[in-house]
Amino acid sequence: MPPIKRQPRGWVLPGYRYLGPFNPLDNGEPVNNADRAAQLHDHAYSELIKSGKNPYLYFNKADEKFIDDLKDDWSIGGIIGSSFFKIKRAVAPALGNKERAQKRHFYFANSNKGAKKTKKSEPKPGTSKMSDTDIQDQQPDTVDAPQNTSGGGTGSIGGGKGSGVGISTGGWVGGSHFSDKYVVTKNTRQFITTIQNGHLYKTEAIETTNQSGKSQRCVTTPWTYFNFNQYSCHFSPQDWQRLTNEYKRFRPKAMQVKIYNLQIKQILSNGADTTYNNDLTAGVHIFCDGEHAYPNASHPWDEDVMPDLPYKTWKLFQYGYIPIENELADLDGNAAGGNATEKALLYQMPFFLLENSDHQVLRTGESTEFTFNFDCEWVNNERAYIPPGLMFNPKVPTRRVQYIRQNGSTAASTGRIQPYSKPTSWMTGPGLLSAQRVGPQSSDTAPFMVCTNPEGTHINTGAAGFGSGFDPPNGCLAPTNLEYKLQWYQTPEGTGNNGNIIANPSLSMLRDQLLYKGNQTTYNLVGDIWMFPNQVWDRFPITRENPIWCKKPRADKHTIMDPFDGSIAMDHPPGTIFIKMAKIPVPTASNADSYLNIYCTGQVSCEIVWEVERYATKNWRPERRHTALGMSLGGESNYTPTYHVDPTGAYIQPTSYDQCMPVKTNINKVL
């Protein structure tokens, strides 16, 4: 029989019916959302051709609609189709669209060609429909950063993307997506930054009221910065509850930050009146220190992190750093003239100017993006229900015997160990418990101080004056004094009072362990435990209020990294994103250094992909979970529950450790 006459299908992607050129308008039912968007795109092209226009040579409204239709589609076809027409938008002339041509002009005027990123490193809004495969595919693979990193956080100097005045460069993103392998958190905040230090670098002396305490020398800069280093910045209380109730471990994998919808305004004062005008020519300097070339800014537990509540304005903190240990270089030796050692240290004091790096200068209506990759360990959420020394069957006799020394006598005997008391090879972790904090109450000391005292320097204070206090390295040892318990302030909003939260004893049997040694008559506590073979312990349990990471110091050698607060030690955490107002000089009759008084506000969004593992258990009994039960009441009239707002708008923050929902309290693990 003669062959069936088939209609040509066009140059479509394999498995698709419309995603490609030259296919017929009626080629069957679209296979997915990307194919359906391509079908509508083909019909729009057909109408343009009928009107006498060539849509293949010009970027047009049909192309713009196609890109918009695929903004939430992360299938392979959607990525390829969207990428193709984004390239066309950047290089092809607009088809009778002056607004689009103006946007192209801003794109080329402000883009950084050396920092172009692949499709996979672009921001990923709209993750509510993502599957595990989609989320994995959308993670950044490579970033064109100015440094070569072998994992950890990297930052790219993304091109400034302009859309002109009155054209939005992005929408507000928020919410979280939970799946079996990945969790995606999305948050947006309104930020504001102002002129710092009159555009100058200055050295400030920070003195304490305690004369024998620590003094510091700080270099303050014209720059401010963004800090995303806290779990509460990314997880709502309900999201954190779900994460800690359903997953046995998690870790960050990729982070994308977008700064957009910039509005630069000039402050004009005329007597008692103040007006705020849009300034379309002023700019802000923005760059990311992806190679960690400047002193670290995102120290754990700082108060400058992104606000918990999405409607709160984020007032960026000024960036400053310590250039030298002040007590070692204050030139108070040799009768206050300074000795050779002090001068040698002072001569080598560094001075970091952030303007010494390439960066963008963005104007009103423009935007920029930064991408980071993480290479870090997991945060484990399982608790040990028994210590490792009880990993045995207590009904089965053991062949082990022990040597027993009789009380008050040199006589000894040998006895068989009972089945329920078998010895173990597993020892508690290392730690130090033999120190206490030095008073008085106004002192800024710590239980342990690390001091650097080069020979020849003149020291006229105690150890607190030239030492650095650090959290007691307790490993998994149980706190014997209050100094060893993690504490932090949780200030109730609007009260001005400091609410002190103290970490509770852990519910995991691989934490809060103690080592005792026998002396023939009793057992005594061992306060200092060094590192030995066969020590096993769990890391400190974190809460929603904890920092995510801490930066490892660049050192030749180090032992096992186990930060006291449970944060993740990273060689390359996300680089700090710095921002400052551009200096706009104005002429004066006296030739004084004068400039326009401006500030900048805009939106900053942060999206993090978290790798997760759901828990699986053979435990028959129900387990403990974080719930709303047990939350306290506060606020005006004392009837507003935690994580809610009272009639005055004050947000009721947690007042106890359990309300912060710590990990390692719910899911049991088999050792």
UniProtKB/Swiss-Prot annotation:
Compositional bias annotation for Polar residues: 136-149
Gly residues bias spans: 150-161
A single GO molecular function term of this UniProt record: structural molecule activity
EC number of the protein: 3.1.1.4
Presence of keyword Hydrolase: yes
Entry keywords, A to Z: Capsid protein, Host cytoplasm, Host nucleus, Hydrolase, Lipid degradation, Lipid metabolism, T=1 icosahedral capsid protein, Virion
UniProt keyword Membrane present: no
Stretches the record annotates as Disordered: 106-161
Effect on the protein upon substituting D42N: Almost complete loss of phospholipase A2-like activity
GO biological process: lipid catabolic process
Pfam families assigned to the protein according to its UniProt record, in alphabetical order: Parvo_coat (PF00740), Phospholip_A2_4 (PF08398)
Reactions mediated catalytically: a 1,2-diacyl-sn-glycero-3-phosphocholine + H2O = a 1-acyl-sn-glycero-3-phosphocholine + a fatty acid + H(+)
CC annotations in GO: host cell cytoplasm; host cell nucleus; T=1 icosahedral viral capsid; viral capsid
Residue ranges of the motif Nuclear localization signal: 614-625
Domain of life, source organism: Viruses
InterPro entries attached to this UniProt entry: Capsid/spike_ssDNA_virus, Parvovirus_coat, Phospholipase_A2-like, VP1/VP2
Residue segments, region Phospholipase A2-like: 11-66
EC class name: hydrolase
Subunit field text: Heteromultimer of isoform Minor capsid protein VP1, isoform Minor capsid protein VP2 and isoform Major capsid protein VP3. Isoform Major capsid protein VP3 is a homomultimer. Isoform Major capsid protein VP3 is 10 fold more abundant than the minor capsid proteins VP1 and VP2.
Known function: Capsid proteins self-assembles to form an icosahedral capsid with a T=1 symmetry, about 26 nm in diameter, and consisting of 60 copies of three size variants of the capsid proteins, VP1, and VP3, which differ by the presence of an N-terminal extension in the minor protein VP1. The capsid has a channel at the 5-fold axis and there are densities extending the 5-fold axis into the interior of the capsid. The capsid encapsulates the genomic ssDNA.
This protein's domain notes: The N-terminus of Isoform Minor capsid protein VP1, VP1u, contains a phospholipase A2-like region. VP1u may play a role in the disruption of host tight junctions in the airway tract.
Family from the record: Belongs to the parvoviridae capsid protein family.
Name listed for the protein in its UniProt record: Minor capsid protein VP1
Organism: Primate bocaparvovirus 1 (strain Human bocavirus 1 type 1) (HBoV1)
